[in-house]
Amino acid sequence: MGETKVIRIEDVSKFVGQTVKIGVWLRQKRGSGKIAFLQLRDGTGFMQGVVSVGDVDEATFKLAEHLKQESSFYVTGEIHQDSRSEFGFEMAVSDIEIVGESEDYPITPKEHGTDFLFDERHLYLRHQKPFATMKIRDEIIRAIYDFFHKDGFLKLDSPIITDSAPEGTTELFPVKYFDKDAYLSQTGQLYAEAGAMAFGKVYDFGPTFRAEKSSTRRHLTEFWMIDAEMAWMHQEDSLKVQERFIAYLIERVVDNCQVELKMLGRDVEKLRAYTKLPYPRISYDDAVKLLQDNDFKIEWGVDFGSPEETFLAKRFNSPFFIVNFPKAIKAFYMKRPPSRDDVVISADMLAPEGYGEIIGGSERDTDYDYLKQQIISQHLDLSEYSWYLDLRKYGTVPHSGFGLGLERLIRFIAGEDHIRETIPFPRTLNRLHP
């Protein structure tokens, strides 16, 4: 008889009726005097192992009875299909081979507070909810690369250490760069514009840092951002790229992460409906009027906060765009429409169900003198932006782009209440550990 085949839990459906071996950790266990039910995980999925007195020797049964939570071991047994099981399959265990015994595990099978779970995040990642969320995160990341590759974009890596604030903000993390002052990047967008002038369509994807003293459920101080920039493209075509992009990412998760979505209690059919295009649009002007008509105390020229975005999101049953924001509340590089000087050709995409903004974008201004004046009027250091202005001196073209916050998108698709659930080790106003 040959050696027992070692497999992974995600592949058990291929081995029904066969005896296999799996390297696992013990999530938890229950049982009576003659049977033990082992809840197992291996990093690819979850399943149950059943240890019965009549099927194993006395030593193996005692070993199963005394296993501690998160002990690691090889488990051998026959795979059975079982519709009553949460996972559809279980193993009739015949042998257990201990690899690493566990001490008393701190995250016991009971209710724990959020602060405790994130203090123990290095262990909490092993549990079912973060497992499902990280699998969805992984699928979205792979889908992002696939979308841009298929759409003819080049991956451009923007620097993380910069000498300026791309959007003129003061919410920066300073770092010492030898004898100079530098900052952790907030966005790679300006560098992506340079890339678009060289390669046509580019995107970057990496960590960004914002020193916002905000502790809302939508803010992280370190998060992952996608910046896409497209030469020879006006805003209307950019919006079409954006909605195709989001619909594709949702579709990939719906197609490939149904088990994980079920673990999180997410309605798959509701998500699938969000892939229907085109997405609705409402102007900033009309959004303000709608809010005012519904007793919101908001004036034209003010940016929307969470209550306003939540209200607007409930008016639509899909992601939607708010277009043409006031110039005063947007970045200096955004283009103005020919008919108005008080707004810019910009758009934010908001997710439905009150999840808020997931994309921000605009058509970029190509007027050298106007951009130079904008930089000066916003009290930015002109010398730090000389390279950016060069892009308008040497063959400028119409171009547009957008930025997507990865964790905000994951929060929406996974249905998470708080954004800290969407990244392995969150960094927030009050959390820098572990």
UniProtKB/Swiss-Prot annotation:
One of its GO terms (molecular function) is asparagine-tRNA ligase activity. GO terms for biological process: asparaginyl-tRNA aminoacylation. InterPro entries: Aa-tRNA-synt_II (IPR004364), aa-tRNA-synth_II (IPR006195), aa-tRNA-synth_II/BPL/LPL (IPR045864), Asn-tRNA-ligase (IPR004522), Asp/Asn-tRNA-synth_IIb (IPR002312), NA-bd_OB-fold (IPR012340), NA-bd_OB_tRNA (IPR004365). Its EC number is 6.1.1.22. It is found in: Cytoplasm. The keyword Kinase does not apply. Pfam families: tRNA-synt_2, tRNA_anti-codon. It is an enzyme of class 6 (ligase). It catalyses: tRNA(Asn) + L-asparagine + ATP = L-asparaginyl-tRNA(Asn) + AMP + diphosphate + H(+). GO terms for cellular component: cytoplasm. Keywords: Aminoacyl-tRNA synthetase, ATP-binding, Cytoplasm, Ligase, Nucleotide-binding, Protein biosynthesis. Its main location: cytoplasm. Belongs to the class-II aminoacyl-tRNA synthetase family. Homodimer. This is Asparagine--tRNA ligase. The lineage of its organism: Bacteria, Bacillati, Bacillota, Bacilli, Lactobacillales.
